[in-house]
């Protein structure tokens, strides 16, 4: 009997076509959340080239309310606005705060969707903004390997966000996101980082 149960578990684990096979989270995986995030993030990734043609960096973020309404969608603007903290996540937070007329987004139960794992700076901005949920695509390690960007030191951030009531889902639609990052690099776009 144990052998049958073990075989069934192995078959289920190895051959599952689950939408969240590679997805990670700081809560029990919710397939409905992953499905919604997959659609939104795939759309953001498709918009990436439109933004990079206008001088933006290869990262796009959007903030939605808990009813699924888009609040803002923006891109990284470090190079075209000459400001090192204008990452997509930070720009999205600033735009949402301005649109909603507040520095505290917590009462709005907002969700941030972004084409790559937030860097060290953006994690602080997200935490202090009051965003309730974060969904990202390409993990930092892949971003660094593909582009050479420095994503910073981020120990145990999933746990730290959970302690603060912030839900995180990652590694959503990574293949398309990685492809867009490769396109950015292969087209000779600016890799911006401090000269140390």
Give each language-model segment a name:
Residues 1-4:
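Positively charged n-region of N-terminal signal peptides that target proteins for export
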Residues 10, 20-51, 118, 125-196:
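Zinc-dependent deaminase
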Residues 59-65:
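Short beta-strand scaffold segments in enzyme catalytic cores
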Residues 71-79:
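Short beta->alpha transition motifs characteristic of CBS
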Residues 105-116:
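Immediate flanking context of iron-sulfur cluster ligation sites
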């Amino acid at each position: 009997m144990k052998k049958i149960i073990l075989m069934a578990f192995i078959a289920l684990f190895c051959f599952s076509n689950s939408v969240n096979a590679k997805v990670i989270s700081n809560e029990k995986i919710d397939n409905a959340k992953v499905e919604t995030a997959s659609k939104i993030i795939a759309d953001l990734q498709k918009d990436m080239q439109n933004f990079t043609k206008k001088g933006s960096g290869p990262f796009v973020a959007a903030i939605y309310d808990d009813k699924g309404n888009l609040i803002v969608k923006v891109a990284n603007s470090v190079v075209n606005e000459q400001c090192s903290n204008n990452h997509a996540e930070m720009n999205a937070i600033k735009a949402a705060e301005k649109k909603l007329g507040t520095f505290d987004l917590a009462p709005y139960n907002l969700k941030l969707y972004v084409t790559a794992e937030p860097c060290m700076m953006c994690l602080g901005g997200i935490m202090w903004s009051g965003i309730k949920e974060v969904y990202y695509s390409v993990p930092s390690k892949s971003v660094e390997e593909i582009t050479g960007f420095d994503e910073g030191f981020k120990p145990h951030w999933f746990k730290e966000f959970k302690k603060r009531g912030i839900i995180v889902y990652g590694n959503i639609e990574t293949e398309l996101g990685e492809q867009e990052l490769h396109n950015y690099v292969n087209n000779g776009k600016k890799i911006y980082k401090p000269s140390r």
